Design a protein with these regions (language model features):
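Polybasic "coupling" helices that flank or enter modular domains
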Residues: 103-187
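Cyclic nucleotide-binding regulatory domains
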Residues: 44-104
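Short, Lys/Arg-enriched C-terminal cap helix and immediately downstream tail that follows
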Residues: 160, 200-201
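DNA major-groove recognition helix of helix-turn-helix
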Residues: 190, 194-197
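Short N-terminal helix-initiation segments at or just after the protein's N-terminus
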Residues: 1-8, 43-55, 109, 178-186
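Hydrophobic residues at beta-strand termini and immediately following loops
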Residues: 37-39, 80
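Cyclic nucleotide-binding regulatory module and flanking cytosolic helices
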Residues: 1-35
């Protein structure tokens, strides 16, 4: 697969800059520790029980993180699309085995960031540290709390509409069974919600 590395590197840079100002010198240091990675649909990025070494920026494609219980039942933990980072944060931070698997739902172009080297850069560069703090606050605190509250306070239709507002084309790209699992409902429930919305539109 041929692709424009400069474009996707710039997409990653813009992602960083959306959280905090970063100098060109610091960005060059980041560029030195990234690698492009191609993943085919159905391939595994991170397996349950594997220790994560990298965090991945999604340039193109979609992935899901899923948990398998003792009975073999699978539950989607998250769905990741373009412009998002995918990885096991707990595994990266604690260097412990991941509790979930990350699988490609589409052919993907990813940028892999070596987390150990990335942490070294954070410790040496205040602008990268400011970005890291801002990213953690938004994604690991604010959005996590908002999603937990939504699971309790919002009904399934509201959660589905929120998902469509963030990702309008998701229902055309991701199998509905994965979307349903992500929302904490059954595929049958999601089908009813979609039919009801179609009738009212």
């Amino acid at each position: 697969m041929t692709f424009n590395k400069d474009k996707y590197s710039n997409d990653l840079k813009l992602k960083f800059l959306s959280y905090a100002p970063i100098t060109d010198a610091s960005w060059k240091l980041v560029e030195d520790i990234i690698e492009f990675q191609l993943l085919k649909k159905g391939e595994i990025l991170l397996r349950n029980g594997q220790i994560a070494r990298e965090i991945h920026f999604i340039c193109k494609g979609a992935l899901r993180a899923y948990i398998t219980d003792k009975e073999g039942n699978i539950y989607n933990k998250n769905i990741f699309l373009e412009g998002y980072f995918a990885g096991s944060k707990v595994s990266l931070l604690q260097q412990t085995p991941s509790d979930f698997t990350i699988e490609a739902l589409e052919d993907c172009i990813l940028i892999a960031i070596n987390y150990k080297k990335y942490r070294e850069l954070i410790n040496q560069n205040d602008d990268l540290k400011n970005y890291y703090i801002a990213y953690l606050e938004k994604n690991w605190v604010i959005e996590k709390e908002q999603r937990e509250i939504a699971l309790v306070m919002e009904n399934a239709t509201e959660r589905y509409l929120d998902l469509l507002a963030k990702h309008p084309d998701i229902s055309h790209r991701i199998p509905l069974l994965h979307i349903a699992s992500h929302l904490g409902i059954t595929p049958t429930q999601l089908s009813r919600i979609r039919k009801s919305l179609d009738k009212n539109s």
